[in-house]
Amino acid sequence: MKRHITTALLSAILLTAAAQQKETSAVFKLPPLPYQYDELEPYISRTTVKLHYDTHTRGYLDKANKILRKDTPDSISQNLAEIVRNSEGALYNNAAQAWNHIFYFDAFSPHAITEPGGKLMQQIEQQWGSFQNFKNTFAEAATGLFGSGWLWLVKQPDGQLAIIAESNAGKVLKSKSVPLLGIDVWEHAYYLDYQNRRAEHIDALWNIIDWRVVQKRFAGIPRP
């Protein structure tokens, strides 16, 4: 009898431990940045990069993971972009913000090529006249976005480029366009470094946006 109770108790402990492990294990893990926290200085400070990525981005991903484990276990086999495309409400908001931020940070480099080339540059010049005109239009859209949100350069199904401003997490992955570049214009992205000077922040980003990354996205590298 004593042995039977011990076996039952051990089974219960193992089941509890397995349940706890499932509850605490991450569905999606935050990838490491492709550079050190301080390598984007002086354009984005170490403090902002660390807070923005390790706290804000991780927070969105942790919340999305919690919802997935609890409410939609069948979605665990999907990648994060598919979760974004197929979700709504709180799961969408957190998964989209996590994906947006990872995409955003991945386009930066301390050794950035600060102008596009090849077919992407040709398309920009065809539509905006020059790369400088494109940058001016992009910056105007960023500073003109009311409140918090995202600014996107996208490739539309017809091959044309478009600058899209969206509030909150936006819905770029729910569209038929391919995102090439995303800029976070929530205040947490720049307030520690630039206070309310959003335009100055956008202007600084041109120094660290790596157009090699954007060109790969434009060239048809599989959609994220």
Predicted segments, located by residue:
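Bacterial Sec-dependent N-terminal signal peptides
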Residues: 1-22
